[in-house]
Amino acid sequence: VRRTETEPIKSITPLDTGDTPMLPATEQWINIRNLGAKGDGFSDDTHIFQEAVQKYANIYIPQGWYVVKEPLTLKQNTNLIGLHPGTTILLSLGGNPAFSGFGAPQAQLTTPQGGKNIVCGIFLNADAYNYRAVNCKWMAGEGSYMYDVKFSGHDKARFFHNGQSAANPLEKPMSITPETHDLITRAWDNQHWSLWITNGGGGS
């Protein structure tokens, strides 16, 4: 029999957070569903999100497909905290007037210049057929943090196994063929960059 000698740990070195801001306590979060958001991939949740940003600092977004038809601009201290970028989706359906047509780039999500925002755990999906769309315009500065965020793009995972578009899980299923994938790919080529860092944007 082999014996192992162990000693109890006398102390633990405190976690060095460095430049990475910590999430606020969960008691300070407001659940977007409790404010009336549906997250069903069909209902328009735009105004629910806009009002939440005006009233609350820490907005929790559980899993769901949240249709946002207009640009969403955060305040200086707004934090968007999603459950998981694979299941928490902010999406703009294809052909949305706010993001399609011709003109300057238009961001789904914008952080203010010098903001101290935290954005995490979400999937920003602008759809391939919104040609002016940018997923995120990031101008937040020191003390801000973006992590675990997914952007829509050249990704076959855009489709479910039954052919439904990830931009709208309720639409009529589309047969998956080389031709349909080619159409999507060419549509993405017309779109702007996904992450637009400008005006001194930075953070962690």
Show which residues each predicted segment covers:
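Extracellular "leader-to-stem" segments immediately downstream of a signal peptide or signal-anchor
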Residues: 1-59, 85-87, 91-120, 125-126, ...
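Beta-propeller domains
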Residues: 190-193, 200-204
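Beta-rich ligand-binding surfaces for carbohydrates and other polyanions
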Residues: 135
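Beta-solenoid repeat scaffold
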Residues: 64, 70-93, 117
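Leucine-rich repeat
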Residues: 128-132
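Low-complexity, polar/charged sequence tracts that form flexible coils or short amphipathic helices
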Residues: 71-73, 138, 187-188, 197-199
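A generic local structural motif
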Residues: 47, 66-67
